[in-house]
């Protein structure tokens, strides 16, 4: 029998310096965003670059690695799962946010534009 999994794999570049936080219980987490680019040719024959931004979060030892080694422009490969959280904003509106909770992180060494 086959089972489907919630699995995401991305290769891209960090948009800014990672944001290091601690929970009320003292657990460290690091949040950062990664841009992925896709290229295609439109119906006019022009090459088009389409950028998607993905919000990621690392916990535990991966948070330590992210804090120590990641910087704006760092090229990374990540694997994780999609997690959607619901919250109430400052105006009392219910909102949801989806992020990738990573369980693997590879530093690829390139910078944006390489």
Predicted regions and their residues:
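Single-stranded nucleic acid-binding surfaces, predominantly the OB-fold ssDNA-binding core
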Residues: 1-114
């Amino acid at each position: 029998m086959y089972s489907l999994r919630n699995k995401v794999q991305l290769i891209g570049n960090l948009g800014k310096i990672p944001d290091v936080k601690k929970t009320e219980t003292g657990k460290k987490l690091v949040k950062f965003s990664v841009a992925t680019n896709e290229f295609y040719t439109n119906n006019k024959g022009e090459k088009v670059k389409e950028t998607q931004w993905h919000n990621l979060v690392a916990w535990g030892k991966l948070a330590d690695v992210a804090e120590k080694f990641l910087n704006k422009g760092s090229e990374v490969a990540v694997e994780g799962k999609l997690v959607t959280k619901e919250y109430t904003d400052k105006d009392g509106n219910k909102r949801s946010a989806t992020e990738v909770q990573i369980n693997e992180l590879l530093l690829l060494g390139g910078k944006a534009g390489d």
